[in-house]
Amino acid sequence: MQILTTHVGTTAMSHATEIAFGRFSKYAPQIIMHLIDDNLFSVWNTTFNYCELNNHYGFFVPVELALYTVMSPNQESFVAVNETEFGIIITQLFIVIVLRAAKVCDIEVERMMVHFEILHDYAKMVCSSDAYALYESLVSFYKS
């Protein structure tokens, strides 16, 4: 199956995230950059302001094809992940934070929950075993 992506720059970022994440899209830039600051060990040499928003699964992918070194939640180990794995991890953590903060379970919250499950299943398929283990530990950490 071919997965189509849409390149979004700074001006289109809010529109693209609004399509994927509804009213929660306005929090994406701040939360995603905070997650990167907290979890990325390697130098951040690209930006999510210029990224691919995957149209099928709805996750951000850094423009630069590279390996990113991500810290485990206990900050005792590091895992190298590719740009797709990194995008999935960061997007899922964004969704977890939004769902934890949501006060009312409305249609957009339900849509985000479904989005999380779809992307979770996709992560199982495309992530390496190390990246998937890191993904699960980070999601568990941010859920608690």
Segments (PLM) and residue ranges:
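Polybasic, proline/glycine-rich intrinsically disordered low-complexity segments
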Residues: 4-7, 72-144
